[in-house]
Amino acid sequence: MRAVPTWIDKVHDRDKVEQCIYDLAFRPDGSQLIVAAGNRVLVYDTADGTLIQPLKGHKDTVYCVAYAKDGKRFASGSADKSIIIWTSKLEGILKYTHNDSIQCVSYNPVTHQLASCSSGDFGLWSPEQKSVSKHKVSSKITCCGWTNDGQYLALGMMNGVVSIRNKNGEEKVKIERPGGSSSPVWSIAWNPSKDEHNDILAVADWGQKLSFYQLSGKQIGKDRSLTFDPCCVSFFSKGEYMVLCGSDRQAALYTRDGVRLGSIAEQNAWVWTCRVKPDSNYVVVGCQDGTIAFFQLIFSTVHGLYKDRYAYRDSMTDVIVQHLITEQKVRIKCRELVKKIAIYRSRLAIQLPEKILIYELLSDDSADMHYRVKEKICRRFECNLLVVCSQHIILCQEKRLQCLSFTALRQREWLMESLIRYIKVIGGPAGREGLLVGLKNGAILKIFVDNPFPITLLKQNTSVRCLDMSSNRSRLAVVDEHNTCLVYDIHTRELLFQEPNANSVAWNTQCEDMLCFSGGGFLNIKACSFPVHQQKLQGFVVGYNGSRIFCLHVYSMAAVEVPQSAPMYQYLERRMFQQAYNIACLGVTDSDWRDLATEALEGLDFHTAKKAFIRIRDLRYLELISSIEERKKRGETDNQLFLADVFAYQGKFHEAAKLYRRSGQDGRALSMYTDLRMFDYAKDFLGSADPKDTKLLMKKQADWAKNSREPRAAAEMYLSAGEHLKAIQIIGEHGWVDMLIDVGRRLDKAERAALSRCAVFLQQLQQHGYAAELYSKMGDLRALLQLHVHATHWDEAFSLVEKHPQFRDDVYVPYAQWLAEHDRFEEAQRAFHKAGRQAEAVRVLEQLTHNAVVESRFSDASYYYWMLSMQCLDIAREDSEQKQEMLKKFHSFQHLAELYHVYHSVHRYMSEPFSSNMPEILFNISRFLFHNLSTHTPMGISKVDTLYALAKQSKLLGAYKVSRHAFEKLQSLKIPARYQDSVELSSLTVRSKPYRDNEDLIPMCYRCSTNNPLLNNQGNSCINCRQPFIFSASSYEVLPLVEFYLDQGISDEEAVSLIDLEVPRVEKNKSWQEMSSGESQCLKLEDGPDDPEDDPFTAKLSFEQGGSVFVPVRVSRAVLRSMSRRDVLIKRWPAPLSWQYYRSLLPDVSITMCPSCFQMFHSEDYELLVLQHSCCPFCRRPIDESC
């Protein structure tokens, strides 16, 4: 850092008496300087120090001045207790007074409110206010300052206190300095930096201390001792530095943390005030003797560079190491003035005022940025240049070079014949590095650290400014004092060439033949002996690595990517392909790589071309080069043919065709033009080419017609060329049905692929008849079936299956799926069954059944369970392994079907407002259901609904005992809230009824004639003989039927034949009986009861009953012969079930049995239900369907 005086002035009054300069203030734009001198306010032009105008208005000494941030006005305060507000046009506009002399003034940077401070109070004035608000203080105010946001005002006082107040003058923070009144606070300043998170206040007191505080009053760090009484502290505009002045008669530069960096100006009297010009490096000081001195601070660049690592000084006390490739930075805080920096490999040397620090990298990683202290040399050195090596530091002092170890031992010294102008480490083994030294007299020497004797490389007539040696140390570049770049051959000391306008030079570390130099705002790149390539660039070139040029501009180092295109093209012009490739490797664009590869390929330098195409990943050309290399290995040597291939790849087709013809390869030319659809040019080569190529040409021309959106022409060309599949594809895609039919009929049936493709397109175009015609022509029955299935032409499919049963699965399975998709699930189940897909059929039925139960469609659930049972019976008949399991499921599903059939009526009674069933029927149904729910309740069936219906109908019909029992059962169940009151009320009222049942309702066993209770422990069987009751499937009354079984050895067919014999019985004489009433007479033919001995079946009933175990009725052949066919009902179950036989004991009661589900009905009920539903109410068999 150097301070250069710009101008100096000394202020006197009329009597030549020196006027003390108490305060200074800059206009915000820096163009004017306001000076408090004596009782006048002086305005200077900062450019040259001329006095613009003295301002008069005060009657006593002016102590303070301040300029508003907006530049519109400034203020001055005087010992005459007054404040004057001046405009920027130097006109006084306002004056107000305090009770004491004015000590300091300060403008708010945001609101432009003026704070004026005196010995006993301070005032706040703003342009918007007419009056000044004043606030008393306990001590004399010596200095003041606003925070950057204008929210708080700091006051420094004579008693050593710093008071921080808000805009209204209220004290918020009070800072008491340790010295108290013996250390008056003489100057304060807020750091204006925008990078700080907190407002930082610098406080200088006459206890010779400098301190820093946060806005909260918390001190930052410790007090810094000064050797003088500070009179003024002033920050630079960005807050990175500050200036202190005082009783030591000088102004000094400090860091923002209070570290002294150096002296700016030494004067002959106390320096009372100092200010920094806004946004610049100019400092002005005002002295006791009236001197006003204006200085420019010049901060020199302290830096070092080694390859891609650049170290430079920042904020005078820090060192930043920057990796120019990765852009990583690391800051090393030294907390002292950094004087010199040197960097080499992993070493970093930093010279401080009293010591040299040697740092090293933590690891050998090229990207590592972690440094640690290796050695400290605690000695003061004076030197012009500093160089560091692996184990030494080199100090340059004028003509002398000293080599010191890291322990400060002087190991070697060299004395030069002239001043040393440039020094550079050029590498070498650790401890034996070489140095390149340039002298003022033009001598250039090489010095080795371990050798006391310098080696003179050459000597020129002009002074050396910059040096660099090429990577293999064969050439030397020198920039002399006339800005000329000279390049020498080190071995012969011959001057190779020279270039003007150079201020620095650097060889490319990766290419021996390239160097760059800068000067005159241009960057110059020179390759070999070619002309220089220029481009604009500001700064000094300090390094050249590959395509990166390291350039120092003012204080910043930048790595500039410079494409090496120009030198590469210079080599290409001379067909030096390998050298051009080496240059391109340093960094060129993709288009440059392509140009290099193309030029090398045309020059038949396949090796270089291949490497260049690899760089840009051009696989097409790499394949070409690979094929050429393979052909050369096989012995091909015709370079014209190779070049023709290259031209063809490059799009130079006519040149390629000419070369093909010269080489006798007309076929290749024909193929090339054909692929390019240049059929007119291709025809020129047809005569001399292979005749087979004519057909190929037609195919290619058809392809071209297709791609050029002329499909009809393309199809016709394909047909002409025999490419039927391609022609059919085009015709089909465009939906030309007539052409498809015509092609299909013309094709031979042996061309199955073309016919099949044609049929597929006809099918897609909904022309099923023509498609069927083609499939029939091919004899493809499976495809024909699939066509019918796809078109849902089921009748044609079924008729075809009848002729070819092996395709049954191909039809019935899709048919079943189609039915299921159209919600025709029952038909789908039957179709699955026909297709032999029992598992799918059962799965469909199970899903239908589950859905019906969940949706409370219990009639449907009953029907589906019946169908499931019949499905299981079919499986049991067909699969002997699953016979027992399927028979078990059959009986279970039959039982469930009957339960859901019954519960359907109960559910309708409970959920609908009216019921179509008679009370007796509902009573029978609910009683039947109750007897079957004693052990297990199927899903969906409500026991509550069953018992409630039974209780209600029992009560209605007079079966009070049953009703009471049902209501008691209901009490143990969870009853829905809507029935709760009704159940409780009915349960009470039924207790008022007699505890008996209506005798008309009591069922009788037709085998043993025993009256059974309505609630039977045996369920739906007789309590005496255990004979199961047979119920009507509509009214659920007990039918007068008794099941009987055949004796051993009697088959079903024999039994039926015996029953059909109907042996006539001996008729007894019948008599007439007269019956008369009051108004009529009638005769009745008396038909007396048969004698049991006359009916063998009745005898079986009488003599084989009794016991606790049910004993079925078994009949012999004689008994079968005695039976009437009208009295016997037979359930003719399919195998593997046996038939069931029932004898009606009341022949006059007409009973009808459904031939499909074998359910028994009263004939009248059955006929009525069939009329209503046109089918059986249980199995839904239509009345016109034969079983």
From Swiss-Prot:
One of its GO terms (cellular component) is intraciliary transport particle A. Residues 1070-1094 are annotated as: Disordered. GO terms for biological process: camera-type eye morphogenesis; cilium assembly; heart development; intraciliary retrograde transport; intraciliary transport; melanosome transport; mesonephros development; negative regulation of smoothened signaling pathway. SMART domains: WD40. WD repeats lie at residues 16-54, 57-97, 99-135, 137-175, 180-223, 225-264, 266-306, 459-498. It comes from the Eukaryota. It is found in: Cell projection, Cilium; Cytoplasm, Cytoskeleton, Cilium basal body. Gene3D superfamilies: 1.25.40.470, YVTN repeat-like/Quinoprotein amine dehydrogenase. Pfam families: Beta-prop_IFT122_1st (PF23381), Beta-prop_IFT122_2nd (PF23377), TPR_IFT122 (PF25295), Zn_ribbon_IFT122 (PF25144), Zn_ribbon_IFT122_C (PF25143). Disruption phenotype: Reduced number of cilia in embryonal pronephric duct and shortened primary cilia in Kupffer's vesicle. Embryos show shortened body axis and curvature, cardiac edema, small eyes, pronephric cysts and a distended cranium; shh signaling is reduced. Keywords: Cell projection, Cilium, Cilium biogenesis/degradation, Cytoplasm, Cytoskeleton, Developmental protein, Repeat, WD repeat. InterPro entries: Beta-prop_IFT122_1st, Beta-prop_IFT122_2nd, Ift122/121, WD40/YVTN_repeat-like_dom_sf, WD40_repeat_dom_sf, WD40_rpt, Zn_ribbon_IFT122. Component of the IFT complex A (IFT-A) complex. Required for cilia formation during embryonal development. Acts as a negative regulator of Shh signaling. This is Intraflagellar transport protein 122 homolog. It comes from Danio rerio.
